[in-house]
Amino acid sequence: MARKMKSMDGNNAAAHVSYAYSEVAAIYPITPSSPMADLVDQWAAAGRKNIFGTKVRVQEMQAESGAAGAVHGSLNAGALTTTYTASQGLLLMIPNMYKMAGELLPAVFHVTARALASHTLSIFGDQSDVMACRQTGFAMLAEGNVQEVMDLSPVAHLAAIKGRVPFLNFFDGFRTSHEIQKIAVWDYDDLAEMVDMDAVNAFRQRGLNPQHPQMRGSHENGDIFFQNREASNKYYDAVPDLVEEYMGKINAKIGTNYQLFNYYGAPDADR
């Protein structure tokens, strides 16, 4: 389907995509990510539907730590859930990020990368916040401009759903989050066509339900803990191919050339 052209910033682009693939958004505002949460809240209040035909349930928490806990709980209940944050707010989410990754929950965090406070606070952009999350087990996907945010944000959601590995999708705070560009916008019908509904249904079936109770969050001794941690490696090994697969589907729809690695140079180069 031909895409419409609209003028918007990076926050709007990420919010547009995340609304399509989310059933719950647990939010707490922090500059420069706040417009994403605000837009999603406005759209839900106006009755806008996601690709599943429902409104996104938006819940503002008392802090970013609470938002992360709500994301974790919502995912465990079988609802596709996202949040939006940056800087110190992202650091408050790290404890829950370890849990989400360890439990193979398809969380997607949209982050406007921003400097961490040191001797003083700074609202301007670097990537010290997202780099502090590399060890959590979240896959990380980055975009460099507003059109890329629109085009590639679906990859984070689609790969998380099918691959069961949570994603941190980020772009530069202010430089991209607040830059207004005229871009091609996804139609929700196109976004719906790319989602693996079998994976969505399997995720929902794994949700906590009193009709088929299960035990989570138990204690394990080192020998069993080690084996269960190793068992998750196959999901991480599959992530690059999944990302490439969904980039290919996006390329087929919109004529782009997104790949994990793009070569630029002489076609006959030998060194």
Can you annotate each of these PLM segments?
Residues 1-132, 137, 154, 173-174:
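Thiamine diphosphate
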Residues 123-173, 185, 197:
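Conserved thiamine diphosphate
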Residues 52, 56, 167-263:
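Conformationally flexible catalytic loops at phosphate/diphosphate-handling active centers
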Residues 268:
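RNase H-like, metal-dependent nuclease domains and their acidic two-metal-ion catalytic environment used
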Residues 35, 148-151, 241, 245:
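Generic recognition of stable, solvent-exposed alpha-helical segments in well-folded globular domains
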